[in-house]
């Protein structure tokens, strides 16, 4: 796999508070290799390791995106909900930024039925005004609840190839479903997390909003660049030759 430069600078990570962990009393022993120091009673994440792991993960998602792999981003913290939705739309990823519905992946047959119903209701929106008020109100209420819980995955036709988990403790149900189905996971791991539960751990503060956005934006950039390469390589050869000769 080719190594690329993702402009991951230590000073930017410090500014985003990526390095700040939890109280040392909350440390997960398996996080010891990723911790470089402690400030008063707070563990400090080794940012050189964060930079290396993040860079390697960006290389991997670039390659995956260039091969057409599908991503699901899971981040339900209220403070990052809008950032998750915007980032996912930018990179053409599925996302969950509200409450995770238990069994969303492990009970995929039921989820598919819900998604089919959701898409059907979206198509029916135009005729809601022609329905009796009571019927229209029921459908609007159903549509509202489905949009809230499944809005970010409404066009997901099959299980994702890779899932990005932004908070191991907060999204543990989603992570457990991925483990059960052997879906590869990328995860921010704070000093109180278990790095062994995810396939690609990125040591980082998962409580600081700037930290989450910093990591997410790097991954999204890599996915977007991978998608762009896929678009270019999939063009007919005569078009690529014309562009090259310009």
UniProtKB/Swiss-Prot annotation:
The question of whether Ribosomal protein is a record keyword is answered with yes
Signal peptide from the UniProt entry? none
Q: One Pfam family for this entry, by name? A: Ribosomal_S2
The record's SUPFAM superfamilies line, in alphabetical order, gives: Ribosomal protein S2
One example of the protein's molecular function in GO is: structural constituent of ribosome
Keyword Ribonucleoprotein assigned to the entry: answer is yes
GO CC, sorted alphabetically, is: chloroplast; mitochondrial small ribosomal subunit
Which InterPro entries does the protein's record reference?
A: Ribosomal_uS2, Ribosomal_uS2_bac/mit/plastid, Ribosomal_uS2_CS, Ribosomal_uS2_flav_dom_sf
Tell me the GO BP annotations in alphabetical order: translation
Keywords, ordered alphabetically: Chloroplast, Plastid, Ribonucleoprotein, Ribosomal protein
Q: Which Gene3D superfamilies match?
A: Glucose-6-phosphate isomerase like protein, domain 1, Helix hairpin bin
Q: Which family does it belong to?
A: Belongs to the universal ribosomal protein uS2 family.
Q: Name it.
A: Small ribosomal subunit protein uS2c
Q: Which organism is it from?
A: Pelargonium hortorum
Q: State the gene name recorded for this protein.
A: rps2
């Amino acid at each position: 796999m080719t190594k690329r430069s993702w402009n991951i600078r230590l000073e930017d990570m410090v500014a985003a508070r990526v390095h700040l962990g939890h109280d040392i009393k909350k440390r997960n022993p398996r996080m010891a290799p990723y911790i470089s120091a402690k400030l008063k009673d707070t563990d400090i994440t080794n940012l050189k390791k964060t930079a290396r792991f993040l860079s390697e993960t960006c290389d991997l998602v670039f390659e995956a995106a260039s091969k057409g792999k599908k991503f699901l981003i899971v981040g339900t913290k209220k403070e990052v909900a809008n950032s998750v939705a915007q980032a996912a739309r930018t990179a053409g990823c599925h996302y969950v930024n509200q409450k995770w519905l238990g069994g969303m992946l492990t009970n995929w047959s039921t989820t598919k039925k819900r998604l089919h119903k959701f898409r059907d209701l979206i198509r029916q929106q135009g005729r809601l005004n022609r329905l009796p008020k009571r019927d229209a109100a029921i459908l609007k209420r159903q549509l509202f609840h489905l949009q809230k819980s499944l809005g970010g995955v409404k066009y997901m036709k099959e299980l994702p190839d890779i899932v990005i988990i932004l908070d191991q403790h907060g999204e543990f149900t989603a992570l457990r479903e991925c483990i059960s189905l052997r879906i590869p996971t990328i995860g921010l791991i704070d000093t109180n997390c278990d790095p062994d539960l995810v396939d690609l751990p990125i040591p980082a503060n998962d409580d600081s909003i700037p930290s989450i956005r910093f990591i997410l934006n790097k991954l999204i950039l890599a996915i977007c660049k991978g998608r762009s390469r896929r678009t270019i390589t999939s063009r007919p050869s005569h078009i690529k030759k014309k562009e090259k000769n310009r």
